[in-house]
Amino acid sequence: MAEEKELVLLDFWVSPFGQRCRIAMAEKGLEFEYREEDLGNKSDLLLRSNPVHRKIPVLLHAGRPVSESLVILQYLDDAFPGTPHLLPPANSGDADAAYARATARFWADYVDRKLYDCGSRLWRLKGEPQAAAGREMAEILRTLEAELGDREFFGGGGGGRLGFVDVALVPFTAWFYSYERCGGFSVEEVAPRLAAWARRCGRIDSVVKHLPSPEKVYDFVGVLKKKYGVE
């Protein structure tokens, strides 16, 4: 496909938001060019492409920028309809499909609003505030586990494969070890089915290729702590 060569992702290696875009394109079989950004010295291309938020990830498709990772995932479904869907296909007048799409969007938004926010506080805080954030994270993971239920994947696109919520959430599994170390809990103990889901995802080629090791992420968290004077 000629369009595949026109995809460029402006990204940063440890960003879960960029990783979800990379995984989505890999799942769809789309070729893309990865361009690592120096977030301390952002490129002119990034600043021109996302002048409102001035942040990664940005997907350039034939030179046209698309910003915000969940928007990018939905754009990929729309722009490449012949590839595996992340969201259930939209069928005019099909209330069940509309509900499934809305539900997937809700849980992806939950990941961004709750899990990401709490995870950021976990490494920034100390003492009892950090312990409280650890308890909050454990409850967030239990909530996600309840939504997963007995399914193999959260799904969305069908066919027993990664769907919209899976792709939105799976990059954060590389941060689970850091959450455990900072929060004083075990993901396996508080949400064993979610931990099993993470292991299943971790055997999928697109995830293996585009997620860093938990240890490398934890080393990065240590750098952040020093940078912000947490330690």
UniProtKB/Swiss-Prot annotation:
One Gene Ontology biological process: glutathione metabolic process
Top EC group: transferase
Binding site for glutathione: S15, K42, I56, E68, S69
The reaction(s) this protein catalyses: RX + glutathione = an S-substituted glutathione + a halide anion + H(+)
Keywords: Transferase
GO MF annotations, alphabetized: glutathione transferase activity
Top-level taxon: Eukaryota
Any one GO CC term of the record: cytoplasm
Domain GST C-terminal: 97-220
Start and end residues of each GST N-terminal domain: 5-84
Enzyme Commission number: 2.5.1.18
InterPro entries: Glutathione-S-Trfase_C-like, Glutathione-S-Trfase_C_sf, Glutathione_S-Trfase, Glutathione_S-Trfase_N, GST_C_Tau, Omega/Tau-like, Thioredoxin-like_sf
Record Pfam families: GST_C_2, GST_N_3
Protein family per UniProt: Belongs to the GST superfamily. Tau family.
Protein function: Conjugation of reduced glutathione to a wide number of exogenous and endogenous hydrophobic electrophiles.
Protein's UniProt name: Probable glutathione S-transferase GSTU1
Natural source organism: Oryza sativa subsp. japonica (Rice)
